[in-house]
Amino acid sequence: SVMGKFDLSSAKIKERFVGDIHFDDDWQIGLIVGNSGTGKTTIAKELFPDSYVTNFEYKEESILDDFPKEVSIDQITRTFNSVGFSSPPSWLKPYSVLSNGQKMRVDLATSLLQDEALIVFDEFTSVVDREVAKIGSHAIQKAIRRTDKKFIAVGCHFDVEDWLLPDWIFNTMELFVVFVAYCLFHIL
């Protein structure tokens, strides 16, 4: 076993993060940012479990047909445009054939069209090139500020701060991480 190879006990290990997120009541955009493995997703899910954007299901031949019937085509296309997804030919394609950047924008539009007051979007701009990240961040920032919604981007790229213009930032690299173990470990 791996544990035996490194002379490790099978006792439970817990990792606890200690830190504070300070923000005023009137914020609209927040950013949780840090390197991989620093607890961003864990923190976001713990603090905002009901607002966490998960994978949406897109099954139709046209992305436009994946939205609820009570949402008008005009609302959908305005929201698409507001997040920088401004290609009518692409609106007619199924989600599965869209680029990662287009998928990110469709997911952002989908979350904006829901009745949720808070949107927590994990892996924000993680799978897109930095130019698409810049355009997408700026577009979502403008779209959110036109609403009464709150948006939290969770991601590993620090550059989005300049484009997203968050009201608050929580950098997980500044966390104090406490390891709690029920036994002592040593590696041979």
Task: Set out the residue ranges of the language-model regions.
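ABC ATPase nucleotide-binding domain signature region
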Residues: F17, I21-F85, C156-L164
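Pre-NBD coupling/linker segments of ABC/ABC-like ATPases
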Residues: S1-D24
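Conserved ABC ATPase signature
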Residues: P94-S99
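Walker B catalytic motif
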Residues: V120-D129
